[in-house]
């Protein structure tokens, strides 16, 4: 397999992100929120933490079958971000993020095969707000991530579906 510059950069960024995450404190970095107990439509506001590679909420709660609108605010002035809800665990989230690298910005940094993606926002440019509406899946815990190259290791959270 030929190792390209792009692959080397992704590997270095991923390794750096893992080191930074391992050095982080043990405290909570985000709250739980959501409109979860009802069955009516709910809008949840979430954003990025300024120029950090982090969501401002790391856990959201909704009810199975509920119509959910995620209003994602990119609070960075310069970076692009997105909000992607993944069907499957961490391995599937990593596969989606890695495939997004090859897909590029024209494809929202998402693979052509979206069978393991429950919901996806458009790319949000600096200080832009985007929305995605979907029906909450069956009860369980699902990961949401940003698939912009290098962001996935730090930009993830959990959607808890009751």
From Swiss-Prot:
Covalent lipidation (N-palmitoyl cysteine), chain numbering: 23
Q: Which GO terms describe its molecular function?
A: copper ion binding; electron transfer activity; oxidoreductase activity
Q: Which CDD domains match?
A: Azurin_like
- Localization of this protein: Cell membrane
According to the UniProt record, one GO cellular component term is: plasma membrane
Please give the biological process terms from Gene Ontology that the record holds: photosynthetic electron transport chain
Q: Where is the lipid attached (S-diacylglycerol cysteine)?
A: 23
**Cofactor requirements of the protein:** Cu cation
Assembly and oligomerization: Monomer.
Its recorded name reads Auracyanin-A
